């Protein structure tokens, strides 16, 4: 039997992960990016951009459930939701499961990403692009949040790492724009990397977000193919009570929602805000 090809992630110089490639579905390498989607027997379809895993069919539900249900159930009565990025459609899929949400706006810089993912990652969106509450806006995320006349109850930044095209979604200009179009008591969340290996990223986001929000923190989830430990999500709001809701309140909202999840549950929600000591110490050592 011929040996299978291997794809190696290149995010870190001294260590990393690899995947056996059963079948390459798409590969485009240009001067600007290297995008590949391949099939792997253990993780299903895998999408990687510039040598970094973006999503896999097997474990994407963890990331998307935690990015969606934590802020929406903490808010409790969100009507208008903004997704920045999220072209694969899985974040949209999870938001559409909240029946009390009235409008979902997704801002994607490249229309081609949406059509591409609908073709190659259909399980991610699971038909959610056809939800009547959904509106797609083709625009730069920073420009949109600083120019739109709309306001939102929850903003989810489904961004790539802060290198290349994703870098602008970690800037003060973006955070200030999000504060501008967030309703009073609203919640902003964003992926912030694996804090054990990308701690400076979390510290930088915390410092910048603290200029615009009175309550800034993080919550976490374990996502196998985001190599290196626990994934960190930024959390920012002006209502500090939302990060400390009782488990009874979260449980009641969860039951009322009718959600059936594979990772998220009310106990996980509460526990996710418990941060490791090394991250607490790093945040505490920053100048006020």
Swiss-Prot record:
Pathway: Amine and polyamine biosynthesis; spermidine biosynthesis; spermidine from putrescine: step 1/1. Transmembrane segments: none annotated. It catalyses: S-adenosyl 3-(methylsulfanyl)propylamine + putrescine = S-methyl-5'-thioadenosine + spermidine + H(+). GO terms for molecular function: spermidine synthase activity. The keyword Plastid does not apply. It comes from the Bacteria. The active site is at residue 158. Keywords: Cytoplasm, Polyamine biosynthesis, Spermidine biosynthesis, Transferase. One of its GO terms (cellular component) is cytosol. S-methyl-5'-thioadenosine binds at residues 33, 108, 140-141, 165. GO terms for biological process: spermidine biosynthetic process. Residues 9-238 form the PABS domain. Its EC number is 2.5.1.16. Signal peptide: none annotated. The keyword Magnesium does not apply. It holds the Pfam family Spermine_synth. Spermidine binds at residues 64, 88, 158-161. It is found in: Cytoplasm. Homodimer or homotetramer. Belongs to the spermidine/spermine synthase family. Catalyzes the irreversible transfer of a propylamine group from the amino donor S-adenosylmethioninamine (decarboxy-AdoMet) to putrescine (1,4-diaminobutane) to yield spermidine. This is Polyamine aminopropyltransferase. It comes from Escherichia fergusonii (strain ATCC 35469 / DSM 13698 / CCUG 18766 / IAM 14443 / JCM 21226 / LMG 7866 / NBRC 102419 / NCTC 12128 / CDC 0568-73). The gene is speE.
């Amino acid at each position: 039997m011929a040996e299978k090809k291997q794809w190696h992630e290149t995010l870190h110089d001294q260590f990393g992960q690899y995947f056996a490639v059963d079948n390459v579905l798409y590969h485009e390498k240009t001067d600007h990016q290297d995008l590949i989607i391949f099939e792997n027997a253990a993780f299903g379809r895998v999408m990687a951009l510039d040598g970094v895993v973006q999503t896999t069919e097997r474990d994407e539900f963890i990331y998307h459930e935690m990015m969606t249900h934590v802020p929406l159930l903490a808010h409790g009565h969100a009507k208008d939701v903004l997704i920045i990025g999220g072209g694969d459609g899985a974040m949209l899929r999870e938001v559409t499961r909240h029946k009390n949400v009235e409008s979902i706006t997704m801002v994607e810089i490249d229309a081609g990403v949406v059509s591409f993912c609908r073709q190659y990652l259909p399980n991610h969106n699971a038909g959610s692009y056809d939800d009547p509450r959904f509106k797609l806006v083709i625009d730069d995320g920073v420009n949109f949040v600083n120019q739109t006349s709309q306001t939102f109850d929850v903003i989810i930044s489904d961004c790539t790492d802060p290198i290349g095209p994703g870098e602008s979604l970690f800037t003060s200009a973006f955070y200030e724009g999000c504060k501008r179009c967030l309703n009073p008591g609203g919640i902003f969340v964003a992926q912030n990397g694996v804090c054990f290996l990308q701690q400076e990223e979390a510290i930088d986001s915390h410092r910048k977000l603290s200029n615009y929000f009175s309550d800034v923190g993080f919550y976490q989830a374990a996502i196998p193919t985001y190599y290196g430990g626990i994934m960190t999500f930024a959390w920012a709001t002006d209502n500090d009570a939302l990060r400390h809701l009782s488990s009874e309140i979260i449980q009641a909202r969860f039951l009322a929602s009718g959600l059936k999840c594979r990772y998220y549950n009310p106990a996980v929600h509460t526990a996710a805000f418990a941060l490791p000591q090394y991250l607490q110490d790093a945040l505490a050592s920053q100048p006020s």
